[in-house]
Amino acid sequence: MLDPDKPTPLYRQLAAILRGQIERGELTGRVPSIKTLAQTHGVAMGTAERALTLLRDEGVIVMVIGRGAFVNRSGDA
């Protein structure tokens, strides 16, 4: 659950939630779209996009233009 009163930025909180879902095997394959994440978690699309960008930069997911974001199965994360 995202908490706007925490000092941690919302995009980092969302990234942590998604990372946890991936680590627990709850999120595999395709990651929900930016729009879906924004609606589901009650944040702006820019916040959801920033969360996915952070996970991409960490190697947790890969983003393919025109196709979406996917859990990185290569083990590089």
Which residues make up each language-model segment?
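Extreme N-terminal segment that seeds HTH/winged-HTH DNA-binding domains in transcriptional regulators
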Residues: 1-43, 49-62, 73-77
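Minor-groove-contacting beta-hairpin "wing" of winged helix-turn-helix DNA-binding domains
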Residues: 67-73
